[in-house]
């Protein structure tokens, strides 16, 4: 009898708890998570750090920071070996990535994804042929035309071609097979739909797209450099109508695309006799940049260079005047591997794989403003949010 009373009492108490829980649930409506948020910093303060996370490459991501204070603003996932760029109008974030059905195996799907730049929310994906380049984050592997209408990307199957994507229509337009044997995409800022690529014969191929994104015309320059004797880095210091390339041995070659055909020039050397005696050479990934208003070019350099050190981090950053072809400043390199320049605000970002350094470059000698520490696990690319055109 006593045991029965206890069971009855327990059942009554449980019933009261359920009723109370129901009443409480009615008092507090269920929260619905819709995803996304509004990025707190203004667009002009944002920078994008492409984190390859080498130790778990299927989880690459883009970190967004406020460069003025180092605040973390958000993240965009980019799956396996992602690449990123921000649309020229600053409204969208474009990523290029690969998915496999079983993460590390299974059917492969290559896509370009479009994300809202203010909310960091996914909008759409554009299917690609399963041959987009899978490599480190060089700027020239994933670009867009100056008018912003087309994404231009590097393919490697391993045969090389360049893919054209119509962003508005969400279509893969075509393969530019004329770019076989050529590598990287260099948009020409003075033309709406033109770009160059570096070819295996030491020359440059220029492709002009029509309004439909198909090849309208093309031309090849004469040989600019010797692939065997003086190979160049694919990262250019890019002006409105000229591109400067540095070689593994510290020479500079230039390509002028102000006219109908590209005219190549060079080389001239970054090095004086003392530099040569110490074997100073360039090194890094996105290792050069140009401040267009002043004509100053920034190059990552290290001493004791030899075969195989072309990706060594910067011992120093050299500032070269491209008009006089003289060095005007040199500062500690802070082991940087990549850089980017903001033309409107006279700023430079450098990246050592994890930390981002912010410099004022309004004067010949760059001034370090701040360092954003631990910005990524393993990053080789950093970008400003576009402000005031390309």
UniProtKB/Swiss-Prot annotation:
InterPro entries, alphabetized: Host-pathogen_enzymatic-act (IPR051200), Metamine_DH_Hvc (IPR009451), Quino_amine_DH_bsu (IPR011044), WD40/YVTN_repeat-like_dom_sf (IPR015943)
Inhibition and activation profile: Irreversibly inhibited by phenylhydrazine, hydroxylamine, semicarbazide, hydrazine and aminoguanidine. Reversibly inhibited by isonicotinic acid hydrazide (isoniazid) and isonicotinic acid 2-isopropyl hydrazide (iproniazid).
Keywords from the UniProt entry: Disulfide bond, Electron transport, Oxidoreductase, Periplasm, Pyrrolidone carboxylic acid, Signal, Transport
Domain of life: Bacteria
GO cellular component: periplasmic space
Disulfide bridge positions per record: 182-199
Positions carrying Pyrrolidone carboxylic acid: 26
Gene Ontology MF term list: aliphatic amine dehydrogenase activity; aralkylamine dehydrogenase (azurin) activity
Signal peptide: 1-25
A Pfam family assignment: Me-amine-dh_H
Annotated compartments: Periplasm
The EC number(s) this enzyme carries: 1.4.9.2
Residue positions binding substrate: 54, 57, 81
Catalyzed chemical reaction(s): an aralkylamine + 2 oxidized [azurin] + H2O = an aromatic aldehyde + 2 reduced [azurin] + NH4(+) + 2 H(+)
Family: Belongs to the aromatic amine dehydrogenase heavy chain family.
UniProt subunit comment: Heterotetramer of two light and two heavy chains. Binds two azurin molecules per heterotetramer.
Function: Oxidizes primary aromatic amines and, more slowly, some long-chain aliphatic amines, but not methylamine or ethylamine. Uses azurin as an electron acceptor to transfer electrons from the reduced tryptophylquinone cofactor.
Protein name from the UniProt record: Aralkylamine dehydrogenase heavy chain
Organism from which the protein derives: Alcaligenes faecalis
């Amino acid at each position: 009898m006593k045991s029965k009373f206890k069971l009855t009492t327990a059942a009554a108490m449980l019933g009261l708890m359920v009723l109370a829980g129901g009443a409480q649930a009615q008092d507090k409506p269920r929260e619905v998570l819709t995803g996304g948020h509004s990025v707190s910093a203004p667009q002009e303060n944002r920078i994008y750090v492409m984190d390859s996370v080498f130790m778990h490459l299927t989880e690459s991501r883009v970190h967004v920071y406020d460069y003025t204070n180092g605040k973390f603003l958000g993240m965009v996932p980019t799956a396996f070996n992602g690449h990123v760029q921000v649309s020229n109008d600053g409204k969208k974030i474009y990523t290029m990535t690969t998915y496999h059905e079983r993460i590390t195996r299974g059917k492969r799907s290559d896509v370009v994804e479009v994300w809202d730049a203010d909310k960091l929310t996914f909008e759409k994906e554009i299917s690609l042929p399963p041959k987009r380049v899978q490599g480190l984050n060089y700027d020239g592997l994933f670009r867009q035309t100056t008018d912003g209408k087309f994404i231009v990307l590097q393919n490697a199957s391993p045969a090389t071609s360049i893919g054209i994507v119509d962003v508005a229509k969400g279509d893969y337009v075509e393969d530019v097979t004329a770019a076989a044997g050529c590598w990287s995409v260099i948009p020409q800022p003075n033309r709406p739909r033109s770009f160059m690529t570096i070819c295996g014969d030491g020359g440059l191929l220029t492709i002009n797209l029509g309004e439909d994104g198909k090849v309208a015309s093309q031309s090849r320059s004469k040989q600019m450099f010797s692939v065997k004797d003086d190979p160049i880095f694919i990262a250019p210091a890019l002006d409105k109508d000229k591109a400067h390339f540095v070689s593994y041995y510290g020479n500079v070659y230039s390509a002028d695309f102000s006219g109908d055909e590209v005219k190549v020039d060079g080389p001239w050397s970054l090095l004086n006799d003392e530099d040569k005696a110490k074997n100073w050479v360039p090194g890094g990934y996105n290792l050069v940049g140009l401040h267009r208003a002043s004509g100053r070019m920034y190059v990552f350099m290290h001493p004791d260079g030899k075969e195989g050190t072309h990706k060594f981090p910067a011992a120093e950053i050299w500032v070269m005047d491209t008009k006089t072809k003289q060095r005007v400043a040199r500062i500690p390199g802070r082991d940087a591997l990549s850089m980017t320049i903001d033309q409107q605000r006279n700023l430079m970002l450098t990246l050592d794989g994890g930390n981002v350094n912010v410099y004022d470059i309004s004067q010949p000698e760059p001034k370090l403003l701040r360092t954003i520490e631990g910005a990524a696990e393993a990053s080789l690319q950093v970008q400003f949010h576009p402000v005031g055109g390309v």
